[in-house]
Amino acid sequence: MNQTGDLANLDGLGEEEANRLKSLMKLRNAMYSDEFRGWLRRVTGCGPLSAKKKDMSINDYRHGCHLLNHDDVISTRRISFILYLPDPAEPWQPEWGGSFEMYPVKEKHVPDDLPSNIVPIKWNQFNFFVVQPGHSFHSVEEVVHPTQSRLSISGWFHRLQPDEPGFSQEEEDRELQAEKEFSSVGSLISKKFMDAFVEYDEATYGGPSLPGSRMSTEHLKFLA
């Protein structure tokens, strides 16, 4: 995947460069507005969204690009979004790949192996969902078309930050605990979800020598 830096950095451009990107800045500012955040809150019931912390970048998926299954739980993310912008003159075809795939949970905080919903790409389509530890599992299907560009603007709206009105440390602590216990990243580092490591018993192991194993007397004699 090819990705730009955070579009918040557009504020640092000079006048000439900013004029070249007026449409992009207008779109970014509209999505960062109080009105748009308020609409997302009403639709999702996600609770307060930060006016300070937001992430947004342009992503270009080409041939072979994909995204593995994960739940997007990183930092204080509350809502994930994707605005699809493939070439409108040549509508994106499902057989080109790149579809957005959503997964059910087959057991507690473990995603199923197969998606339950596949969302094809369309110009100007806006997808969004509430980030939930151990639940908001999704992936991006591999792009298989040799030349087409799956262009999009994507990012995250975040929970309230400590210096914003309405911030609750108690609520934040609950969020952090849920992330630690149930997120896909947390599961990778949690001993709770790890199988115990059992070393091979070299005395009964009948296969090839394991890395780090002592050489047998027979092998030492051969090398001598």
Locate the predicted segments by residue:
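Catalytic core of Fe(II)/2-oxoglutarate
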Residues: 54-77, 84-223
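Proline-centered turn/helix-capping motifs that create local helix->coil transitions or kinks
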Residues: 1, 47-49, 89-94
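Sparse, context-dependent recognition of short Cys/His-centered cofactor- or disulfide-binding micro-motifs
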Residues: 12-16, 21, 25, 41-46, ...
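Non-heme Fe(II)/2-oxoglutarate
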Residues: 1-43, 206-224
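Active-site-proximal binding-pocket segments
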Residues: 27, 31, 36-42, 46-53, ...
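Short, functional N-terminal and low-complexity linear motifs
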Residues: 2-9, 48-49, 106, 120-122
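Residue-level signal for well-ordered alpha-helical segments
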Residues: 13, 17, 35, 46, ...
